[in-house]
From Swiss-Prot:
A motif (Microbody targeting signal) lies at residues 419-421. The gene is Acot4. GO terms for molecular function: carboxylic ester hydrolase activity; fatty acyl-CoA hydrolase activity; succinyl-CoA hydrolase activity. It is an enzyme of class 3 (hydrolase). It holds the Pfam family BAAT_C. The lineage of its organism: Eukaryota, Metazoa, Chordata, Craniata, Vertebrata. It comes from Mus musculus. This is Peroxisomal succinyl-coenzyme A thioesterase.
Length: 421
């Protein structure tokens, strides 16, 4: 009897969906190696492997049988995805074209040899970033450069603006996934994209106000308020929007700092000075890669520092997500300062998700952790922190909590079906 490799859902799934992976038709107690391969849009290969032993019936269910070693060990049904590593140094997995899936090749190899034995079974699974029925709408409205993702159905839907960080450009993959959970989600560029400024010297809040107005005017977006979701500098942009603009009722800050870091923040007559940094405080980590965690100037005065974003002005609740091992900056410390500021101004203590062993790039579930990559400011590779397994668990939990937070405060009751057609 030939071995068969099955993946559920069959054929395709959304990237944030868990998979059930099983092998049948093996010999009792047969040692095998499972291997996964993904090629990104720039040609880089991401790989993982794990050694297993079939049960007495010649079957292997990754939800019931622990890995004996390899890229991971223990009971990790999704380890073949989150434990992937790139074949290029300092390379981060990013999906550029959300209209096409990533193809994940899964193989079963005989034995536990490091280079792999005879191939016993193989399958290819599509991992999509838009659930069936989600619509992608490019937005070039006034100055706004963005992409709107609309859930299936008539709507109107609760709205979210999604902002990424210091890399600039327009990243759509998180917004596409969020839309699959019932939210009209705008992936918003704010520099280094098309005719937007190439460099971000001043954060002009007027631009983001225009994006909020666009969302609230859209017939498929349910007002009167929207939510905001941001990572890193994008998280700080979201905190700025929540502090200065009306019609924001829920904000999620993923490893934000709540400070004006290297740029002035300008809104009408208000100007917030940057905290600034000193590159002489860079260190070299044990790995030989630069560590920039301490280059920012000290937040003298704590929550009353003049470079802090006035988050006490935010109308709605803020969910802070922090990696305790973030090496971009000290997210856990900044989150505590932000909490102190809110409470000092008579606000309730905010909800904080603080994850041990978790680095800077907290992505949707099952994205491989990026331990180090090129940083736009220092123009060299820097470490981002995190331990692979802990970081992966944090991504899964944070995603569930973020979706629940938006559902609670924006009024969505949507529950997404599988990505299968």
């Amino acid at each position: 009897m030939a071995a068969t490799l099955s993946v559920e859902p069959t054929g395709r799934s959304c990237w944030d969906e868990p998979l059930s992976i099983a092998v049948r038709g093996l010999a009792p107690e047969q040692p095998v190696t499972l291997r996964s391969v993904l090629r990104d849009e720039k040609g880089a290969l991401f790989r993982a492997h794990a050694r297993y032993r079939a049960d007495s019936h010649g079957e292997l269910d990754l939800a019931r049988v622990p890995a004996l070693g390899g890229s991971f060990s223990g009971l990790e049904p999704m380890g073949l995805l989150w434990a992937m590593e790139p074949d290029r140094p300092f390379w981060r997995l990013i999906k550029r074209d959300v209209q096409t899936p990533f193809l994940v090749e899964l193989e079963v190899l005989d034995g536990h040899e490091p280079d792999g034995g005879r191939r016993l079974a193989r399958t290819v699974h599509e991992r999509h970033f838009m659930a069936p029925g989600v619509r992608r709408v490019p937005v070039r409205e006034g100055r706004v450069r963005a992409t709107l993702f609309l859930p299936p159905g008539q709507g109107p839907f609760p709205g979210i603006i999604d902002v990424y960080g210091v890399g600039g450009g327009l990243l759509e993959y998180r917004a596409g996934l969020v839309a699959g959970h019932g939210f009209a989600t705008l992936a918003l560029a704010f520099y280094d994209f098309e005719d937007l400024p190439k460099e971000l010297n001043v954060i002009e809040v007027d631009y983001f106000e225009e994006a909020v107005r666009y969302m609230l005017r859209h017939p498929k977006v349910k007002g009167p308020d929207i939510g905001l979701l941001g990572l890193s500098l994008g998280a700080d942009v979201c905190l700025i929007m929540a502090s200065f603009l009306n019609n924001v009722s829920a904000t999620v800050s993923i490893n934000g700092s709540a400070f004006s870091g290297n740029r002035h923040i300008k809104y009408k007559q208000t100007m917030i000075p940057p905290l600034g940094h000193d590159l002489r405080r860079m260190k070299v980590a044990f790995s030989g890669i630069l560590d920039i965690v301490d280059i920012r100037n000290d937040a003298v005065g704590g929550c009353e520092n003049p470079s802090m974003i006035p988050i006490e002005k935010a109308k709605g609740p803020i969910l802070f997500v922090a990696g305790q091992d973030d090496h971009c900056w000290r997210s856990e410390l900044y989150t505590q300062i932000a909490s102190d500021r809110l409470q000092a101004h008579g606000k309730e203590r905010p909800q904080v998700l603080s994850y041990p062993g978790t680095g800077h790039y907290i992505e949707p579930p099952y994205f491989p952790m990026c331990p180090a990559s090129l940083h736009k400011i220092v123009n060299e590779a820097v470490i981002w922190g995190g331990e692979v397994k802990a970081h992966s668990k944090a991504q899964i939990d944070a995603w569930k909590q973020i979706l629940f937070f938006f559902g609670k405060h924006l009024g969505s009751t949507h529950s997404r079906a599988s990505c299968r057609l």
